[in-house]
UniProtKB/Swiss-Prot annotation, chain A:
Protein name: Peroxisome assembly protein 12
A Gene Ontology molecular function term of the record: zinc ion binding
Free-text function comment from the UniProt entry: Component of a retrotranslocation channel required for peroxisome organization by mediating export of the PEX5/prx-5 receptor from peroxisomes to the cytosol, thereby promoting PEX5/prx-5 recycling. The retrotranslocation channel is composed of PEX2/prx-2, PEX10/prx-10 and PEX12/prx-12; each subunit contributing transmembrane segments that coassemble into an open channel that specifically allows the passage of PEX5/prx-5 through the peroxisomal membrane. PEX12/prx-12 also regulates PEX5/prx-5 recycling by activating the E3 ubiquitin-protein ligase activity of PEX10/prx-10.
Zinc finger intervals, RING-type: 307-346
Designated gene of the protein: prx-12
Involved pathway(s): Protein modification; protein ubiquitination
Assembly and oligomerization: Component of the PEX2-PEX10-PEX12 retrotranslocation channel.
CC annotations in GO: peroxisomal importomer complex; peroxisomal membrane
Length: 359, 273
């Protein structure tokens, strides 16, 4: 998947744009990859800040989903209103146009639907996934037989149905993507269909329109009234206002470059560079030295199928990996929960160190 | 058809075609992974058939557009690519390798498999020589193209069109990021190792630790049969330091501190009656 980014640059840099054709599937996958990079990158940044400044950023870290949806709404609304595309689509030189009219979705129903599919649905899907994981874990601890009441029945129904819904959505997306590759469909995702838009490449006229300065802010604009002093003041304020208007563009451009760097890092770590940094055990492991580990001679004199705790035949063999001895599961579980150490060697241990042996 | 196309365009078209194939295959695998286990097992058994079916679906692009998706991206196409020729090309390119491989697998006889491997190796060698000749002198880029006398032509006359600064900016940034990473990575890695080693030197085993994990200083996981330095107090797995041949502390390698089993340092436990 990471080589798709390189393929998108290969395809878009060489092919001539003599006519307005739909973007290549590589561009689309690359911009989707960039879109999925925003949220983990910001989450990692917030976690890092919360670690160093807990008083300021801990609440942001706890409610990251809500803060992120507000930020995403502002960002995508700005891009849809000014550039007619989402943030990542604009970065990869694409724009959205309404299916019926061919106009950019700056206003009206297409923009609202685009915001719902770009910002609202990922949030809802994330919440549903978290709910599914939580309910699945709850019903695995308890059994399904304790279901009573309407709410519990609804929860059980949700746990059963949600995986099928996800599979169906993924299948529809794959089918549309294949149809898009074969030029039999003008949309590559069901969310574009719901938004009522299709994707197109940016044209030079669009790029010139983005850089247009409002008429009354242009430097050479002639003022028919007022004195020279008033003229100088007006020009100064025009420059300040033009700078303020240009500031969101500058900030979003720098933000885009930062995310492109994140995408590049992801590409590097998924390819050959990661192999250089991996270290592993090499060489044969020699046999352990024959040293006396414990001084209790009665432990060593036991039969090999005896438990060192209850001194009976072992039931449900369980190894404690901090020492390697094998016990009954009930004996060692009780002992480790009580004393937090190995009964034979005394090494610190907890229930995470128990290894069930199914032989 | 304007003129014959460059070799680099043909190579790029092949790269794009293989990338599209992998994208389609990943999409199908992604859907199959979401399905129940018995469905996934059936699909795993029928993986070669699924692959051929997907290839056939992608080859329908040539019937409708006269070129493969990668060729269309590069604005090139074969001259005289008739539907009959497309069918023959598909048979030789996709069906024949599938049938020969499947028959050699299903027959179960070792000599047929060995003979098939030899034929495949000879074909690969021929393909490599043909490819080297193509890089040197041009002509057909694959053996099957030579068999069917297929040549790639540009659909339009190549021109110096308007410069796409957005794409060039992304390409320049990509290469700039790569150079920055390759330049600074050794220093970052050295600084990281120094910080990690300093942290590990401070991590010693003390008897006051009650229920916390004893982490190995080599593999950074809970210690399996922990060994502790007799003087320095660093903890490592038995298997991690056994590979160093002389059972010394990996952090205090200049002092050659000997290590012993952690169990020997602890007092005798009390058994439950």
């Amino acid at each position: 998947m990471s080589t798709t980014i390189r393929a998108s640059q290969l395809a878009s840099s060489i092919s001539p744009k003599t006519e307005e054709k739909q973007p290549s599937v590589f561009d689309i996958i690359a911009q989707e990859n960039l879109a999925t990079s925003i949220r983990p990158a910001l989450q990692h940044l917030v976690k890092y800040l919360a670690f160093f400044k807990p008083k300021t950023f801990l609440s942001v870290h706890r409610n990251f989903d809500e803060y992120y949806i507000i930020f995403d709404l502002i960002l995508q609304n700005h891009y849809l209103r000014n550039y007619g595309a989402s943030f990542t689509e604009n970065f990869y030189s694409m724009k959205r146009i309404a299916s019926g009219t061919g106009n950019p979705p700056n206003d009206g129903r297409e923009r609202i639907m685009s915001l719902i599919t770009l910002v609202g649905w990922p949030y809802v899907e994330n919440k549903l996934n978290q709910l599914y994981d939580r309910l699945k874990e709850v019903y695995e601890c308890r059994s399904w037989s304790s279901i009573n009441g309407m709410k519990a029945k609804c929860q059980k129904m949700f746990v059963i149905i949600w995986p099928y819904i996800k599979t169906a959505l993924k299948a529809v997306k794959s089918a549309l993507q294949l149809a898009y590759i074969l030029n039999r469909s003008s949309i590559h995702s069901p969310w574009l269909y719901f938004s009522g838009v299709i994707l197109k490449h940016l044209t030079p006229e669009d790029l010139e329109a983005f850089n247009a300065v409002p008429l009354h802010l242009q430097t050479g604009y002639q003022i028919s009234r007022g004195t020279l002093n008033e003229h100088i003041h007006l020009r100064f304020f025009n420059r300040i206002w033009r700078f303020i208007l240009g500031l969101p563009g500058i900030v979003s451009r720098l933000f885009a470059y930062g995310l492109f760097f994140v995408q590049f890092l992801d590409y590097m770590y998924n390819t050959d560079l990661a192999k250089l940094t991996k270290t592993g055990l090499d060489g044969a492991i020699p046999s352990p030295p024959h040293k006396m580990i414990i001084s209790e001679s009665e432990i060593l004199s036991l039969d090999t199928n005896k438990c060192p705790i209850c001194l009976k035949k072992r039931v449900n063999d369980t190894a404690l990996f901090v020492s390697g001895y094998v016990f009954c599961y009930t004996c060692i579980n009780q002992y480790v929960n009580t004393y937090n150490k190995c009964p034979v060697t005394g090494c610190p241990a907890n229930v995470q160190h128990l290894i069930r042996l199914f032989v | 058809m304007a003129c014959r196309c460059l070799r680099v365009d043909q190579l790029d078209a092949h790269v794009l075609d293989s990338e599209i194939r992998s994208i389609a295959q990943d999409s199908v695998d992604d859907v199959v992974n979401q399905m129940p286990l018995w469905v996934a097992r059936i699909f795993e058994k029928l993986r070669p058939e699924l692959k051929v079916t997907l290839e056939a679906v992608l080859w329908t692009h040539r019937f409708s557009r006269g070129a493969s998706p990668g060729q269309e991206q590069m604005d090139i196409a074969y001259a005289g690519y008739t539907p009959k020729l497309i069918t023959s090309h598909f048979m030789v390119e996709v069906i024949v390798p599938y049938l020969t491989r499947r028959m050699s697998e299903l027959s179960g006889r070792i000599d047929i498999s060995r003979m098939y491997s030899k034929i495949e190796a000879i074909y690969e060698l021929g393909s490599l020589l043909h490819f080297l000749y193509f890089l040197r002198s041009g002509g057909h880029s694959t053996i099957t193209e030579s068999i069917f006398s297929l040549r790639n032509w540009n659909n339009h006359q190549p021109t110096i069109s308007s410069i796409n600064y957005d794409t060039q900016n992304r390409e320049l940034m990509w290469h700039a990021f790569r150079d920055v990473i390759l330049l600074t990575y050794p220093f970052i890695e050295k600084a990281r190792q120094r910080i990690v080693k300093k942290q590990k030197l401070d991590r010693k085993f003390t008897s006051s630790i009650g229920s916390s994990d004893i982490e190995c200083v080599v593999c950074d996981k809970p210690s399996v049969i922990p060994m502790v330095g007799q003087k320095c107090g660093h903890v490592a797995c038995y298997t991690c330091i056994a590979t160093s041949r002389n059972m010394t502390c990996p952090l205090c390698s200049e002092n050659a501190e000997p290590m012993e089993f952690l169990a020997k340092k602890l007092k005798n436990p009390i058994l439950i009656e």
